[in-house]
């Protein structure tokens, strides 16, 4: 059945397909695009997997894996979408990575969301899971307790997903000179963020968040600025599905959310120009890579461009985001 067609209910009424209908389509069409390269067997009971799609992420892949290992991720389900910079070879040697590859269209696969959905629903049903991009680093109060304690606290509140919007971070120097070493955490270098300018409003699929440095420097029009809302940690039951990277289905679970974490977004580093070139050449990103065209238009006008300005605030740990009003401490009222 085509996922966009209308189906008939038992009493003859016409209805839109359910999440299960939609998922069956994505499984058939998009999971078959993936070539299995390495699999480590079934997930152990209680293990939390993380699904990601990568392409030419050699700069950040090591700190990314190490960050989430420290938080308690037990297995990585990673799709390599045509890397030629050593990313695939590095992942093939990582003992906790299940690895697939494909040269299929990232855009037609829901910007990677359909691949993630297919893998998570097949290999990790009815358990807590994560999904994230390689430049996204989850922080929350009580990180030293790990994801297990965070999940327990969410469950006590009757929540089945974590609202953790993106927060763009950057250094005090130019983007070109913002270099991340293989054993260096990006937040050691990119410690600054815009202290104001975020706006929350209810959207079609949940709480929408716009603003931050990308709106300030690249998207003056609030409506066209990139979406920051994310729910990277979810309980993956039968009705949950990823149809976009920002709003998991069903959307009703995304409303009324309070941010108890943030995804620190380390996009503005020395490899940005190569990312721009790849995005413009392939046209595989949102609106024919509109975001990357905006980056190119702005960065080409000024040498040594830096996002840092007088309204920047320094990240010194999760509680600095609580103090700045960017999230709440989920453990603050627990004994």
Please identify what each model-predicted range represents.
Residues 1-66:
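N-proximal low-complexity "stem/linker" segments adjacent to membrane-targeting elements
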Residues 74-82:
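Short beta-strand/loop segment that forms part of the nucleotide-sugar
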Residues 55, 81-84, 94-96, 102-105, ...:
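An acidic- and aromatic-residue-enriched active-site/binding cleft used to recognize and process polar
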Residues 2-25, 113, 140-335:
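Catalytic-site signature of metal-activated, phosphate-bearing donor transferases
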Residues 72-73, 125, 133, 158:
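Short loop/turn motifs at secondary-structure junctions
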Residues 28-29, 86-131, 139-145:
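Active-site-proximal specificity loops/subdomain of glycosyltransferases
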Residues 66-74:
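Short, acidic, metal-binding catalytic loop of nucleotide-sugar glycosyltransferases
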